[in-house]
Amino acid sequence: MHYYVLFTFLTLDLAPVALSLSTCSALDMDQFMRKRIEAIRGQILSKLKLNSPPEDYPEPGEVSQDVISIYNSTRDLLQEKANERATSCERERSEDEYYAKEVYKIDMLPYYTSENVIPPSYTTPYFRIVRFDVSSMEKNASNLVKAEFRVFRLMNTKARVSEQRIELYQILKSKDLASPTQRYIDSKVVKTRAEGEWLSFDVTEAVNEWLHHKDRNLGFKISLHCPCCTFIPSNNYIIPNKSEELETRFAGIDDAYMYAGGDSKSKTGRKKHTGRTPHLLLMLLPSYRLESQQSSRRKKRALDAAYCFRNVQDNCCLRPLYIDFKKDLGWKWIHEPKGYNANFCAGACPYLWSSDTQHSRVLSLYNTINPEASASPCCVSQDLDSLTILYYIGNKPKIEQLSNMIVKSCKCS
């Protein structure tokens, strides 16, 4: 029984050490940087589910301004969120995941407010707009842990195509005619004629922005992935193409269209799907729990750029590493950015967990379970940021957000 408990403890507590690229073993800095570069090469291809780099792609000058505009807005959003986390000393993710959250459901704002009003005719075959009132949650904005948008897909037996890729966008407040009016969030491939199902999208960043900036709450847009249609950013219009209509139907949005033949057009469809209205699920950390955490938390020195880059450190610290896609990886297929600050963690962890302070039976058992791993602490990444890239598969532009690509701080573990 004792061995079972020890094995469970060691497996859970030390698994990140074995999986991390760290400085447990002696490595000179040049060798470690080369290993880091090769790890990034494999990481990017793996995240994009590519076996090898794409061979066919357009020249940089051939990329349209609309594609560049969407890339820039997505990249800027990530940077804004990273800056907000840095200035507000965001709670550690591990604490957010440990404590129980309160869940709130917010239904979509209705298209019509009266039961006696016939809903407007079906006039937007290319996209749907969904809006929410989250003002009641504004006082708890800093407690938001996660927000999820859920919409129920209806079975559409009259659909001309059996499968479509739908995309979710956050509608932006336009500053001028040249600025983007939507920001890509996520996409899903759905079966239009299949039995109905719930679709879920992570919209934490968008809802967090709404809670802090009420005037930016313009809702979400559900549209079709449609490269053959022309999108006009200045007025949010799509040039019609009959072969690319959105034929995916949603409960609470398309009820009137789906059941237009029923009696009382304004009521029948809506009542049929009671409980399946598009909604947000907000998960918040209770205020009393957040206050308790903040009052008892000790301030720790962050091994980040602000500390490590201005101090010469032999011990565990963040080390700068800029990856030039063309020079370091020999890649020309990533159009934006040209490179990025990947960084890495390196250095000794001499005081946290020395081998002579551990019980010999624990060390012996751990070495038996994982003989190639180190029983000493390793310098590993703690906080990581995402990277947004623009690349092409053939002539098709793709904008992807790659998680955990930029090391921001380190720790001994």
Swiss-Prot record:
One MF term in the entry's GO annotations: cytokine activity
Keyword Signal carried by entry: yes
SUPFAM superfamilies membership: Cystine-knot cytokines
Glycan-carrying positions: 72, 140, 241
CDD domains: TGF_beta_TGFB2
GO cellular component terms attached to this protein's record: extracellular space
GO BP of this protein: anatomical structure morphogenesis; positive regulation of cell division; regulation of cell population proliferation; tissue development; transforming growth factor beta receptor signaling pathway
Disulfide pairings: 308-317, 316-379, 345-410, 349-412
InterPro entries: Cystine-knot_cytokine (IPR029034), TGF-b_C (IPR001839), TGF-b_propeptide (IPR001111), TGF-beta (IPR016319), TGF-beta-rel (IPR015615), TGFb2 (IPR003940), TGFb_CS (IPR017948)
Keywords: Cleavage on pair of basic residues, Disulfide bond, Extracellular matrix, Glycoprotein, Growth factor, Mitogen, Secreted, Signal
PROSITE patterns for the chain: TGF_BETA_1, TGF_BETA_2
Signal peptide: 1-19
UniProt xrefs under PANTHER family: TGF-BETA FAMILY, TRANSFORMING GROWTH FACTOR BETA-2 PROPROTEIN
Record-stated family: Belongs to the TGF-beta family.
Record's protein name: Transforming growth factor beta-2 proprotein
